[in-house]
Amino acid sequence: MLRTHLAGELRPDNIGDEVTLTGWVGRRRDHGGVIFIDLRDRSGVAQVVFRESEVAERAHDLRSEYCLKVTGVVEARPEGSENPNLASGGIEVNVSALEVLNEAAALPFQIDDPSTSGEVGEETRLKYRYLDLRRKTQGDALRLRSRVNQAARGVLAEHDFTEIETPTLTRSTPEGARDFLVPARLRPGTFYALPQSPQLFKQLLMVAGMERYYQIARCYRDEDFRADRQPEFTQLDVEMSFVDQEDVISLAEEILVAIWKEIGYEISTPIPRMTYADAMKYYGSDKPDLRFDIQITECTDFFKNTTFRVFQNEYVGAVVMEGGADQPRRQLDAWQEWAKQRGAKGLAYILVGEDGELSGPVAKNITDEERAGIAEHVGAKPGDCIFFAAGETKPSRALLGAARGEIANKLGLIKEGDWAFTWVVDAPLFEPAADATASGDVALGHSAWTAVHHAFTSPKPEYLDNFDENPGEALAYAYDIVCNGNEIGGGSIRIHQPDVQERVFKVMGITEEEAREKFGFLLDAFAFGAPPHGGIAFGWDRIVSLLGGFDSIRDVIAFPKSGGGVDPLTDAPGEISAAQRKESGIDFKPKKGPQGQKEK
């Protein structure tokens, strides 16, 4: 090794030791010919001092991010110059030998200056990601990710799981998003697809008798770029045979407990559960943030005989903003703009005065009986503001769900370090295909119905006999885990019987011929004694970003794409040469037969 110690691990116990350190020049200070440098390596920082004339003279030429090797004796810092913010802040190294391992060009941004970290644009940070990762916060994010990987692997090893890699080059199968396609040079005109998930292969592994599988899997989805999405991402993928929902949830909770321990937090188990129906009814979201106690109150029946036309609708609901009655008019107007940005016409409101009197546009338009009872109905007290949404049920609840989050932020109800987990169970098995398309997903199949999760999710046992007769009523044998309003994992008990799988395909409008073409290998496998099985996949990037307190998953990915799906570092995606196009067969056109049909 080129060094004897790590810079950040030196302590007063090392005083008197001769050490050799390696690292990069951070802050540099020149005090009357004595040069002080913060030398940084992966462990942290140590102050090294150049006092001797020869090395001090050479140290004058050192600049930020020069890569150095220094040898010297560990000494106590002079009294009063200790740095309590550094683990090594009680010592310094008096350098006797200096070797410049490599010089550094002028920096595009400062590495060690926290005051400039927010001023550097993300495109610049990603273009020079290898410099960005020298920053402690960014480097620590990847080290945290590594520890989380190890913690999860430890739990799975204790339960006798086998880590298995599934193919990255496979065939295109409809799974809810667009595939990334790779031309097959040896079979011109044909393409591999990068997997959107290991779903089909892990089910095949259950048929193969592996029983307990996991993988930290790379997944790829060619979807429109939304906020904080990546075209390639990572999930912890787990599958088990001969299990029910309780078995999978129990294991998943063990994994979550282990990885949250990495940041010193103890998750209380069993984690609470709520049904999908309750999540939508009370929180307006299938991933409710439970760090604050604000719920939606349905008012549809309360206003069933109203004369107020706005509330003569399919659904009326409300959320209460405690102390919100004293908001100035400009703030109430800002709420209207906020709602319009989310596709609503506005956000109706009632202000409850300190004397209990109601005011605001809604209060003037409802009946005396409605005015007398609305505050009690929604749980509003004097000084509160009641916000309403009316219209179609789903978008109205979604608006109120977003409003409860906005209220929590404005009132400071979310405290740093708070964690709230819940399982959301009993989601619908199918949803209208139009709803899936409207939300930006790809609706599988060709009927009015598509799968909410994926086409291989089993109906709950009580719906097995009639799910295809009433698709809108059937519930999925599925479970999602939510943390602080983020879905961090989801899974289900899978279909393992060929006839059930074929019935699901039929509901979705996937013909028998299409099913054989796309999923024939899976259907064939089911014919050979496929066991009951189920599993879960955790969104690994999201989990690590939550653990590290990052706003974006890009901060916990070594070399992420920008918001537009571009890699500023390598400038990918890029064009390919004419020779590459020809060699890959990407422009291959099948010959046509006598009747103009493509030859096979």
From Swiss-Prot:
This is Aspartate--tRNA(Asp/Asn) ligase. Residues 199-202 are annotated as: Aspartate. Homodimer. InterPro entries: Aa-tRNA-synt_II (IPR004364), aa-tRNA-synth_II (IPR006195), aa-tRNA-synth_II/BPL/LPL (IPR045864), Asp-tRNA-ligase_1 (IPR004524), Asp-tRNA-ligase_1_N (IPR047089), Asp/Asn-tRNA-synth_IIb (IPR002312), AspRS_core (IPR047090), GAD-like_sf (IPR004115). One of its GO terms (biological process) is aspartyl-tRNA aminoacylation. Coiled coil: none annotated. GO terms for molecular function: aspartate-tRNA ligase activity; aspartate-tRNA(Asn) ligase activity; ATP binding; nucleic acid binding. Belongs to the class-II aminoacyl-tRNA synthetase family. Type 1 subfamily. NCBIfam families: aspS_bact, PRK00476.1. The lineage of its organism: Bacteria, Bacillati, Actinomycetota, Actinomycetes, Mycobacteriales. The record marks H31, G80 as: Important for tRNA non-discrimination. It catalyses: tRNA(Asx) + L-aspartate + ATP = L-aspartyl-tRNA(Asx) + AMP + diphosphate. Keywords: Aminoacyl-tRNA synthetase, ATP-binding, Cytoplasm, Ligase, Nucleotide-binding, Protein biosynthesis. Its main location: cytoplasm. PROSITE patterns: AA_TRNA_LIGASE_II. L-aspartate binds at E175, R221, H453, R494. GO terms for cellular component: cytoplasm. Aspartyl-tRNA synthetase with relaxed tRNA specificity since it is able to aspartylate not only its cognate tRNA(Asp) but also tRNA(Asn). Reaction proceeds in two steps: L-aspartate is first activated by ATP to form Asp-AMP and then transferred to the acceptor end of tRNA(Asp/Asn).
